[in-house]
């Protein structure tokens, strides 16, 4: 079983879009791949049941047919971080449950792509003044990371600091994916500086796609197939 964690440098940078793109090309190429997101907030309620939008989107795009609760153990309605939502809704997160669910997926599928719930330093739990972060989970599960960053203003600082934190905590960054790229001098220079300052390979550059466009899904699939190579992504996944 092979897996990898996809982590973002900031909020609203399109981790789920990139996750969906990667899972889509892996499944399309014949790799039996699952998607996993430990906790999700801001879920919509439908017929008395919470629907994890990110998980629904990835499954819809890639064709994965699984119960959402199997892929996302903790689902919250409140539109704050999953950690805070768990406190507000009095539904605590159990780290062991997350680990067990992920291990079960790893045993059922050949490949698992995990999407981080927030950034690498974001807390998942705070029990008895012991803060457990996404980074702790990644390290405990012995996984490597693909880092997603935005192309625009501010990305150099966010990306270099995140890479530094991951390296200092013994987590290997296998590559960087630049999202929301626009054809201008700023974005080009940002990518060049990120390569120079981190020494991490750029796995792909995804152009900005308006999610409200009528043909958003078709455009995302087209770009995914033209930007990423399934064999390369699968090869980055560490045996766990």
From Swiss-Prot:
Binding site for ATP: 12-17, 54, 115-118, 179-180, 207-209
HAMAP family linked to this entry: BioD
GO BP term (any one): biotin biosynthetic process
Family to which this protein belongs: Belongs to the dethiobiotin synthetase family.
Pathway entry: Cofactor biosynthesis; biotin biosynthesis; biotin from 7,8-diaminononanoate: step 1/2
Active-site residue numbers: 37
Record's subcellular location: Cytoplasm
EC number: 6.3.3.3
Binding site for Mg(2+): 16, 54, 115
TM region positions: none
Cellular component, GO annotation: cytosol
Residues reported in the UniProt entry to bind substrate: 41
Origin superkingdom: Bacteria
Keywords: ATP-binding, Biotin biosynthesis, Cytoplasm, Ligase, Magnesium, Metal-binding, Nucleotide-binding
Organism this protein belongs to: Clostridium acetobutylicum (strain ATCC 824 / DSM 792 / JCM 1419 / IAM 19013 / LMG 5710 / NBRC 13948 / NRRL B-527 / VKM B-1787 / 2291 / W)
Function summary: Catalyzes a mechanistically unusual reaction, the ATP-dependent insertion of CO2 between the N7 and N8 nitrogen atoms of 7,8-diaminopelargonic acid (DAPA, also called 7,8-diammoniononanoate) to form a ureido ring.
Cofactor: Mg(2+)
Assembly mode: Homodimer.
Name of the protein described by the UniProt record: ATP-dependent dethiobiotin synthetase BioD
Entry's Gene Ontology molecular function annotations: ATP binding; dethiobiotin synthase activity; magnesium ion binding
């Amino acid at each position: 079983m092979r897996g990898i964690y996809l982590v973002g440098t900031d909020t609203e940078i399109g981790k789920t879009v990139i996750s969906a793109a990667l899972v889509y090309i892996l499944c399309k190429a014949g790799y039996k791949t699952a998607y996993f997101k430990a906790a999700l907030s801001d879920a919509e309620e439908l017929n008395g049941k919470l629907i994890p939008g990110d998980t629904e989107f990835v499954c819809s795009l890639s064709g994965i047919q699984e119960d959402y609760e199997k892929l996302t153990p903790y689902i919250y309605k409140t539109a704050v971080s999953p950690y805070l939502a768990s406190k507000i809704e009095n539904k605590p997160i159990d780290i062991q449950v997350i680990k067990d669910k992920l291990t079960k997926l790893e045993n059922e599928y050949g490949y698992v792509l995990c999407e981080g719930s927030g950034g690498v330093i974001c807390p998942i739990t705070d029990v008895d003044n012991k803060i457990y972060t996404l980074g702790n989970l990644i390290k405990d599960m012995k996984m490597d990371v693909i880092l997603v960053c935005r192309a625009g203003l501010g990305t150099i600082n966010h990306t270099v600091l995140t890479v530094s934190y991951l390296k200092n905590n013994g987590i290997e960054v296998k590559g960087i994916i630049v999202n929301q790229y626009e054809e201008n001098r700023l974005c080009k220079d940002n990518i060049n500086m990120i390569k120079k300052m981190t020494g991490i390979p750029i796995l792909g550059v995804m152009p900005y796609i308006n999610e409200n466009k009528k043909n958003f899904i078709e455009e995302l699939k087209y770009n995914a197939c033209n930007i990423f190579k399934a064999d390369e992504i699968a090869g980055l996944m560490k045996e766990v």
